[in-house]
Amino acid sequence: MTDLEKPSITGHMFDVVVIGGGISGLAAAKLLSEYKINVLVLEARDRVGGRTYTVRNEHVKWVDVGGAYVGPTQNRILRLSKELGIETYKVNVNERLVQYVKGKTYPFRGAFPPVWNPLAYLDYNNLWRTMDDMGKEIPVDAPWQARHAEEWDKITMKDLIDKICWTKTAREFAYLFVNINVTSEPHEVSALWFLWYVRQCGGTSRIFSVTNGGQERKFVGGSGQISEQIMVLLGDKVKLSSPVTYIDQTDDNIIIETLNHEHYECKYVISAIPPVLTAKIHFKPELPPERNQLIQRLPMGAVIKCMVYYKEAFWKKKDYCGCMIIEDEEAPISITLDDTKPDGSMPAIMGFILARKAERLAKLHKDIRKRKICELYAKVLGSQEALSPVHYEEKNWCEEQYSGGCYTAYFPPGIMTLYGRVIRQPVGRIYFAGTETATQWSGYMEGAVEAGERAAREVLNALGKVAKKDIWVQEPESKDVPALEITHTFLERNLPSVPGLLKITGFSTSVALLCFVLYKFKQPQS
């Protein structure tokens, strides 16, 4: 028993109890244990990992059915995984990517599909430039303080896209961009929140790219190893199948009760679960009004992650890498990536069923989803081999009661400016982690590590172990996965938008017409 503790009425006394055994909670517990803090992790599921989950069987060896991707500028998760001896490998984009739109397949290379229509090109260019420029106005640690926060928080991303885009081509791709990045619909999410989300991931190119972007790499053996290995380090300080139902901090010691009626005491609590899931916990005293309102207003995104396995990577015979961007309302999958193992074994394509499509297709039998996906791949890749998979894995995150969805919680219009400032505010001796509370790569594993370690340092500060100025720590860049600067050409920076072009051409036409009239007027009359 440390000098922090008073006699326990439960016999289970700890300095800190962490609620949630995902990457965020376990990163917090690991850091606390390194300071010799007596910590316990309570995890609701019968496994650790949270929204990361590595399935292992003879058909797949291992497969990440949850969070999997990591890339440059995600320095905390790269540092943590390296410390645990987990290596990364690059997602294959050596061959051509594919865009499928209006029933046709268009191969391309690079982060974004090329656009041949001049007006659509101007529209695309202006869309990405405008989103990035708006994002630069938003403080990553306090988006509610942005100069236009109130204005942007009142509208949805659909409203903003419809305002920015003049062509149907750019508008529909922008809708898909929202679906892919936050597994939600453009009409559901606040423009302020989405612009902040893209900004804190490094901008439109960084968040969407494979090479030099958020999807550049995966972990050899699966991302689930991160949580599993931290659990091994913590030993018996991680308890599974222990959903927390009650927290009482009215006395010197906080009392925690689980669903199976086990009781624990501690001095501090770190909640490392999605905000909406804290509504499953009874608090005494009750949560402050703003916190209580916030947790009721942050829905989770909707996604089904699907992996189709084949005898061989047949798509490579056509010089395709396996990445498909699919713009088709009837298509189950919106985006894919090659999910073949780094040694070339277990050829597979990973695809996401996103947002409205996840809700719709979840009603079908698994075999029907599998068939629809294979038929889609056959059509997009132009190969009947897609119809003959050897195995299929999927994970519907909407049915996970201890996640509520994936990838992350989103802010509907009006919520960020009204309640966003309390997302990280402690409630008494309860501190908040979880990827939603991060300021860099929120929604990703990187954000989970940032949030967990920051919450741990907040507790360490309360315990007198670290100074207040050391709660927020700047992470050095990974030497193994350095980030390349994202640059834009002179034309990309300076090309006009479609309305800008119309103004220019309209003015030019008017001047030419005026000159013609003046010329005619000055001619001698016969």
UniProtKB/Swiss-Prot annotation:
Modified residue annotations for Phosphoserine: S383
Q: Which cofactor does it need?
A: FAD
Locate the N-acetylmethionine modifications and list their residues: M1
Keyword Flavoprotein among record annotations: yes
Q: Where is this region: Interaction with membrane phospholipid headgroups?
A: 520-522
Cellular component GO terms, alphabetically?
Answer: cytosol; mitochondrial outer membrane; mitochondrion
Q: Where in the cell is it found?
A: Mitochondrion outer membrane
Where does the entry annotate site (Important for substrate specificity)? Answer: I335
Q: Which UniProt keywords apply?
A: Acetylation, Catecholamine metabolism, FAD, Flavoprotein, Membrane, Mitochondrion, Mitochondrion outer membrane, Neurotransmitter degradation, Oxidoreductase, Phosphoprotein, Transmembrane, Transmembrane helix
Give an example GO molecular function: primary methylamine oxidase activity
**EC number of this enzyme:** 1.4.3.21, 1.4.3.4
Q: Major location, coarse class?
A: mitochondrion
Mitochondrial intermembrane compartment segments: 519-526
Membrane spanning residue stretches: 498-518
What chemistry does it catalyse, as a reaction equation?
a secondary aliphatic amine + O2 + H2O = a primary amine + an aldehyde + H2O2; a primary methyl amine + O2 + H2O = an aldehyde + H2O2 + NH4(+); serotonin + O2 + H2O = (5-hydroxyindol-3-yl)acetaldehyde + H2O2 + NH4(+); (R)-adrenaline + O2 + H2O = (R)-3,4-dihydroxymandelaldehyde + methylamine + H2O2
* Protein's GO biological process: dopamine catabolic process; positive regulation of signal transduction
InterPro entries for this protein: Amino_oxidase, FAD/NAD-bd_sf, Flavin_amine_oxidase, Flavin_MAO
Where does the record place the site Important for catalytic activity?
A: C374
Entry-linked Pfam families: Amino_oxidase
On this chain, the residues bearing S-8alpha-FAD cysteine are: C406
What membrane topology does the annotation report for this chain? Answer: Single-pass type IV membrane protein
- Provide the membrane-side ranges marked Cytoplasmic in the record: 1-497
Question: So what family is this one in?
Answer: Belongs to the flavin monoamine oxidase family.
Instruction: Describe the protein's quaternary organization and the partners it interacts with.
Output: Monomer, homo- or heterodimer (containing two subunits of similar size). Each subunit contains a covalently bound flavin. Enzymatically active as monomer.
Question: What is the role of the protein in this entry?
Answer: Catalyzes the oxidative deamination of biogenic and xenobiotic amines and has important functions in the metabolism of neuroactive and vasoactive amines in the central nervous system and peripheral tissues. Preferentially oxidizes serotonin. Also catalyzes the oxidative deamination of kynuramine to 3-(2-aminophenyl)-3-oxopropanal that can spontaneously condense to 4-hydroxyquinoline.
The name under which this protein is listed is Amine oxidase [flavin-containing] A
Instruction: Give the organism's phylogenetic lineage.
Output: Eukaryota, Metazoa, Chordata, Craniata, Vertebrata
